[in-house]
């Protein structure tokens, strides 16, 4: 199966939010790489993964009070 790339605009505010995401994403072994651009006003989250949907990512982020919206 081929890697998928998802890009989200988020409500990430700081490095503490990024630490929370790191802890969360350790529960998802199909997420291979991810990064956040804190310099961008939309706080872009980019994820490379297998066998996970954008809805799965959105739901997971909501559990740690991070709002996200997929960009197309």
Task: Name each model feature, range by range.
Residues 1-12:
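Short glycine-/aliphatic-rich beta-strand segments at the starts of folded cytosolic domains
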Residues 10-12, 46-51:
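Short beta-strand-to-loop capping motifs
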Residues 11-28:
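Short amphipathic alpha-helix segments
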Residues 25, 31-37:
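Short acidic amphipathic segments
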Residues 39-44:
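Surface-exposed aromatic
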Residues 48-72:
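C-terminal structural segments of small proteins and small subunits
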